[in-house]
Design a protein with these regions (language model features):
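N- or domain-start disorder-to-order transition segments that initiate the globular core
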Residues: 1-25
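Histidine-acidic residue clusters that define the catalytic metal-binding segment
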Residues: 1-7, 145-169
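M16/MPP (pitrilysin/insulinase) zinc-metallopeptidase core fold and M16-derived inactive scaffolds
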Residues: 23, 28-93, 97, 134, ...
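Hydrophobic face of alpha-helices
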Residues: 48, 66, 100, 117-121, ...
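M16/insulysin-pitrilysin zinc metalloprotease superfamily fold
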Residues: 57-59, 90-123
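Short, structured secondary-structure elements
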Residues: 82-86, 120-126, 153
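Short acidic/His-enriched helical or mixed secondary-structure segments at domain edges of catalytic enzymes
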Residues: 125-143
């Protein structure tokens, strides 16, 4: 299969890959940041995941990121791994400029005030409780990773070792 893939590097170092799909009127803007839980320290985990949540808290010029995207007929989501954090927007192709504008704005002017940070800390701590503490064998993945990667940063889960790390961040 021969895909019409184009790779570009902008003057600011941003690497882009463009793959047109003529069979859809939708566009996906997918951004991968080269940061994940591997970049954390054992005594302070879950922060890459916390930052993923903070990226949806609005910015200087776009107080409601999801609101603007939804008005343009789109949606977004994100996830964090050991190696990178992925953010994506899906919206009608004619509104692609909206996604580029709001992604640029949140990268340059993310809202990081105390209120926004505390709200997202609570959300991530609750997510930790739901997925790790309040579920049968919810901590099994913690144990498996710690056994498999005894000295590597992959030994802690992306959500963190303990909710206290996020609470104290």
């Amino acid at each position: 299969m021969d895909l019409p893939l184009r790779r570009l590097t902008l003057a600011n170092g941003l690497r882009m890959v463009h793959l047109p799909d003529p069979d859809t009127k939708m566009v996906v803007l997918n951004l991968l940041y080269d940061v994940g839980s591997r970049d954390e320290q054992a005594n302070c985990t879950g922060l890459a995941h916390l930052f993923e949540h903070l990226m949806f808290g609005g910015s200087k010029n776009v107080p409601s990121y999801d609101g603007v995207l939804q008005q343009a007929g789109g949606r977004s989501n994100a996830w964090t791994s050991c190696d990178y954090t992925n953010y994506y927007d899906v919206l009608p192709a004619q509104n692609a400029a909206t996604a580029f504008r709001i992604e640029s704005d949140r990268l340059l002017g993310l809202r990081l005030d105390e209120e926004a940070i505390n709200i997202q800390k609570s959300v991530v701590i609750e997510e930790f409780k739901q997925t790790c503490l309040n579920r049968p064998f919810g901590d099994l993945w913690h144990e498996i990773r710690a056994a498999a990667y005894q000295v590597h940063p992959y030994r802690w889960p992306t959500i963190g070792i303990t909710p206290e790390h996020v609470a104290n961040a």
